[in-house]
A protein has these predicted regions:
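Amphipathic, small/basic residue-rich leader segments at the start of a protein or domain
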Residues: 1-87, 98, 104-115, 119
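Short, solvent-exposed loop/turn elements at beta->coil junctions and helix N-caps
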Residues: 59, 125-129, 154-155
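Helix-loop "lid/cap" segments that line or gate small-molecule binding pockets
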Residues: 92-100
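Active-site-adjacent elements of ketosynthase-type condensing enzymes
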Residues: 128-136
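A structural signal for short hydrophobic beta-strand segments in well-ordered beta-sheet cores
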Residues: 138-140
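A short core secondary-structure module
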Residues: 146, 150-193
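Conserved small/polar residues in nucleotide/adenosyl-binding loops
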Residues: 197-198
């Protein structure tokens, strides 16, 4: 791989693709989250270029870059003041689905994650169960091919924008607290789901 040439191709793309508004959103990013509208607009441009998920292999829609290409891309994005992307799905859920998901789940969720059609939030913390996830109380009871989920999640980053949530729930109360926890993917427009922003 000609890394200097790759760096130039990244710079050229960033020069063309980053509007003044997107650069300004990047400048104003103070943590890992950029302005949502800017992040989604930037995600769509990177998706069209095939660069939205630098760590993902080609078989799942990533560019298949090696570690040096990923480092160059990240460095050039920072130097150009690119905003972040909508990352909860791509960086947190995507790699887990690639490894543990069924073929149907991979086929359904991964492309929508990359395109920005699905915006994900994380449903781990609860009142009384912040970093101590073994204390979580949200329950999920099997109902045919579905689950009936009852409980509350808090500190749910991106919930105000999300249409999907990956969620830890208790499915077995007969075992020790660290066991009996399952990982569910839930559509936030499911009946009975309510989201509050403070």
């Amino acid at each position: 791989i000609d890394y200097p040439a790759f760096r130039e191709s990244v710079r050229d793309f960033l020069h063309e693709a980053l509007t003044p508004e997107l650069r300004r959103a990047g400048e104003l990013t103070t943590s890992v989250f950029s302005d949502f509208d800017a992040a989604l607009a930037w995600q769509k441009k990177l998706h069209a270029q095939g660069w939205i998920a630098p760590d993902w292999p080609k078989e799942f829609g990533g560019p298949g870059w090696d570690i040096q290409q990923r480092a160059i891309f990240q460095e050039e994005c920072k130097l150009a003041n690119a905003p972040s992307v909508v990352m909860m799905g791509i960086q947190m859920l995507g790699p887990m689905l690639m490894h543990y998901g069924t073929e149907d789940q991979k086929h359904h969720y991964l492309p929508r994650m990359l395109s920005g059609e699905h915006i994900w939030c994380q449903g781990y913390s609860e009142p009384g169960a912040g970093s101590d996830l073994a204390s979580l109380k949200t329950s999920a009871i099997r109902d045919g091919s579905d689950y009936l989920v009852t409980g509350t999640k808090i500190w749910t980053s991106m919930a105000q924008h999300a249409n999907q949530i990956f969620c830890l729930v208790r499915t077995d109360k007969s075992v020790k607290p660290q066991a009996g926890i399952s990982f569910l993917l839930i559509e936030l427009d499911s009946p009975g789901t309510v989201s509050y922003t403070h």
